[in-house]
From Swiss-Prot:
It holds the Pfam family Flu_PB2_4th. It is found in: Virion; Host nucleus; Host mitochondrion. The keyword Mitochondrion does not apply. Belongs to the influenza viruses PB2 family. This is Polymerase basic protein 2. The lineage of its organism: Viruses, Riboviria, Orthornavirae, Negarnaviricota, Polyploviricotina. A motif (Nuclear localization signal) lies at residues 736-739. Keywords: Cap snatching, Eukaryotic host gene expression shutoff by virus, Eukaryotic host transcription shutoff by virus, Host gene expression shutoff by virus, Host mitochondrion, Host nucleus, Host-virus interaction, Inhibition of host innate immune response by virus, Inhibition of host MAVS by virus, Inhibition of host RLR pathway by virus, Inhibition of host RNA polymerase II by virus, mRNA capping, mRNA processing, Viral immunoevasion, Viral transcription, Virion. Plays an essential role in transcription initiation and cap-stealing mechanism, in which cellular capped pre-mRNAs are used to generate primers for viral transcription. Recognizes and binds the 7-methylguanosine-containing cap of the target pre-RNA which is subsequently cleaved after 10-13 nucleotides by the viral protein PA. Plays a role in the initiation of the viral genome replication and modulates the activity of the ribonucleoprotein (RNP) complex. Influenza RNA polymerase is composed of three subunits: PB1, PB2 and PA. Interacts (via N-terminus) with PB1 (via C-terminus). Interacts with nucleoprotein NP (via N-terminus). Interacts (via N-terminus) with host MAVS (via N-terminus); this interaction inhibits host innate immune response.
Amino acid sequence: MERIKELRNLMSQSRTREILTKTTVDHMAIIKKYTSGRQEKNPALRMKWMMAMKYPITADKRITEMIPERNEQGQTLWSKMNDAGSDRVMVSPLAVTWWNRNGPITNTVHYPKIYKTYFERVERLKHGTFGPVHFRNQVKIRRRVDINPGHADLSAKEAQDVIMEVVFPNEVGARILTSESQLTITKEKKEELQDCKISPLMVAYMLERELVRKTRFLPVAGGTSSVYIEVLHLTQGTCWEQMYTPGGEVRNDDVDQSLIIAARNIVRRAAVSADPLASLLEMCHSTQIGGIRMVDILRQNPTEEQAVDICKAAMGLRISSSFSFGGFTFKRTSGSSVKREEEVLTGNLQTLKIRVHEGYEEFTMVGRRATAILRKATRRLIQLIVSGRDEQSIAEAIIVAMVFSQEDCMIKAVRGDLNFVNRANQRLNPMHQLLRHFQKDAKVLFQNWGVEPIDNVMGMIGILPDMTPSIEMSMRGVRISKMGVDEYSSTERVVVSIDRFLRIRDQRGNVLLSPEEVSETQGTEKLTITYSSSMMWEINGPESVLVNTYQWIIRNWETVKIQWSQNPTMLYNKMEFEPFQSLVPKAIRGQYSGFVRTLFQQMRDVLGTFDTAQIIKLLPFAAAPPKQSRMQFSSFTVNVRGSGMRILVRGNSPVFNYNKATKRLTVLGKDAGTLTEDPDEGTAGVESAVLRGFLILGKEDKRYGPALSINELSNLAKGEKANVLIGQGDVVLVMKRKRDSSILTDSQTATKRIRMAIN
C-alpha cells in the first residue's frame, strides 16, 4: 500500500512524467536485451506500434503496378519511399483491404484440398452441439493427447518422404516410399494438387498436419479423442465445463478405437488357445482394420492400452516401461525394491505364494476414471492419495492399491477359497486371485483395514470404510484429494520380452503386463475389422463359424482331398476345425466323430463310393476325439440360431445345400463358395493321392500277376511291381518307389499317367 502511495505521489510531479515519456533509453543492458538476436522480444508491443505507423508493411515493387496509389476514399495505399535496407516499397494496411476487395481472383479449387484439416474442423464445429455450462470443480489430469484430428499415422520420416515426393518431386535426394499407406497417399495427393498455385512451403506444412500425429501433454477432464481436444478451450475451465457433442468423426480416432477392440478380442482369444503367443501373432498378421493391415497400424500407432501393448510386444516393438495392475497404469517415481517369494496364509487358511516387493517405493496410479499416488514399504501401505470421478471409481483405486501393498490385514480379510480362473480355465496367479476376490466384495477388506484421526490439510479429506467422506477420520493412510495425478508424460519406449503365455517382462524380469490385465469391456468398432484367422470365426457367432468352416474346406479342397486319403489324422487335427466343435452338442460329439471316421474309411477302401460333397459336409464332425459305438446316424445336430438344426448325412438340408449342377454350396442360405474340380478328377484325385509312393509304369502287364486292390498295395516291397485295379475297373502297372523323397510329385503326375495308361 505504501509503495502505491509513493508511486502516485511521484506520478503527480510533472518532471517524473517527462522523464518516463521523453528520455531516451541508453542503458546498455536494456539496449542489448531488445536488440540482440533475431527473436522478437515483445511481439505484441511491436505489432501495436508498427500498426500505428502509416506504412507498416513492405511489399514487392510490382505491387505499385497492381494497386492504385489511392483508394476510393482518396486514402494513400502506398508510399513512394523505399523501405530502408531492401528494395521493397512501404504499404498501408488499407492496401490489404483494397486487395481483398478488388484484387485478382485465382482458381480456388485447391484450397479445400490443401486446407482440408481446417475445412473439416469448420464442418465439425458447425454440426457439433454445445450444451449447458456447469460450474463445478474440475479434476483435470495431464494426459498425452492427440491434438490434430484427421491425420494419417505416418512416422515423421515417412511423412517427410511423402511430402518431398508430392511437393518437390524433382528435388535430388533418396526417397524410399515403402509402406502401402505412403504409396496410396502420394498417388492421391499428386492427383489432387495438379496445377496448384499455392506456395509449396504452405502445401508442405499442411500436408504435415494431415500425415503426422501431433501429441501434447495437456490437462484434460473429459474425452481424450482428438475431436474433443480440438475444442478443449471451449469445454473445460478451472471451475466450469461445457457439454459438447462433436459434429463428426475423424478416421484417426476411429483407428485408435477399433485397434483397441481388435487387440482385446485377439488377446482374449489367444489366451485360451494351446499356444497363445503363436496364435496371437497369426491373428495380428491376418487381421485388417478399415482395410489396413493391423501389423502396419501397430507399428505406427502410439496408443497405449494393455491389449495393444501385448500385441506390440509380441511383434518385437518397444512399449512403455510402466506396468499394469487391476486396470491401473503404475509408474514408479522413486525408491526401489527386490523381489522375494513368500508364503502367506489367507483368512481361510489357504496358503498363497506371493512375490513380495521389499523396499520403499512411490508410484503414480492412473486409471480411466481415477488416479492416485501410492507410497509403500515392504508389505505396508504408508500413504495413498486418491482422486476420482465418483465413489465407485475411488473404491476401485483403493482396492487395487490395498492388494498391491500386500499388507497382511488384506490377506487375512479373504473369506472363502480363492479359485479364480482365466478364460483358458487356468488358475490366476495369487495377486490376481486376491484382486478378483476383493473386486467382487471389499466390505471385509475395508472394515479390517482400520481408521485413524486426520489433520485438516487443504484440498484433502478422509474416507471411511463405507466409502463416505469425512473430515475427522479416514481409513489408515488413505486420503481423497481434489487434484488429479498426472499421467506419466514421457514417451520413452523400452525393449521387452514376451513368453508363450503372453506375459510381458522388462529387461530386469519385472512383469509389466499379462492377459489378466486386458479389459473385458465390449464395444462396437467404428471401422470394419476383418479377422481372416479361423480363431476369430466365433466372434460373430455360431452361424459365422459354420459358414467360415465350409468356406475354408472349399477354398483348400485340393490339399484337403490329398490329406483326407493320405493322412486323415493330421487333417482332423487342423485348427480350422476347432471353432466348429462348439456347435456340436457335447454329449454326442464323440459318437458323430467315430461314425464319420468309419464312413470315410469305407470310402477309402471301396472304390467308387467317394462323394466329394459328402466328405466336405461331414469332415468337420470327424475332428472331435472319436468314440467307438455301433450307432448309425441319418442326421447330425448343430446348435445355430438358438436351437438345434439338422445336417443330413445323405442329401441336402437348409444348413448344408450343395447344388451338383452349379457346384455351389450354400450354408444357412449364405454362399459358401464353388467347388472347382473336374467330375472325373473327383475319384482320380483321390486315387492319385492313394498312389503316392508308386510310379505308374503303363497298362496292365499280365507277367506281374492278377490285379491287386489299392489296399493290398501296401504289402509291396520297395522297387517291386504289380498290377492294380483303379477307378471304374481299369488296371494299370505300378512300381513302389525306392525313395520317399519324390512322393510329393506323385499325386500331381499320377492323374495324368492314369489317363495315359488307360487310353
